[in-house]
Amino acid sequence: MLKASILFITISLTLMLENSYGKSCRSIGEKCSKTVFDRCCGDSICHLTSPFHGKCVKCLKEGQLCTSDKNCCSDKCNWGKCTKEKHY
């Protein structure tokens, strides 16, 4: 019961904060911070240029930092960077 209450309160606070900031997500080309309060819409990703400062892009180019294959234009994320070559 306590876990459910904490989860409900967390979700409620997140939604209230999101609504107080206006738009709930950013479009391609708009500024983002890669946080729940300032995230990119849909499949776009926040390309950070410094901590919490970036721009929403369709995908990350070769050499940029990534967390998964779907972040990269090449669909290949190897050791945290987008690559051209397939990793094995």
UniProtKB/Swiss-Prot annotation:
GO terms for cellular component: extracellular region. Pfam families: UPF0506 (PF11703). The keyword Iron does not apply. Disulfide bonds join 59-73, 66-77, 72-82. Its main location: secreted. InterPro entries: UPF0506. The keyword Secreted applies. It is found in: Secreted. Keywords: Disulfide bond, Knottin, Secreted, Signal. Residues 1-22 form the signal peptide. The presence of a 'disulfide through disulfide knot' structurally defines this protein as a knottin. This is Uncharacterized protein SJCHGC09803.
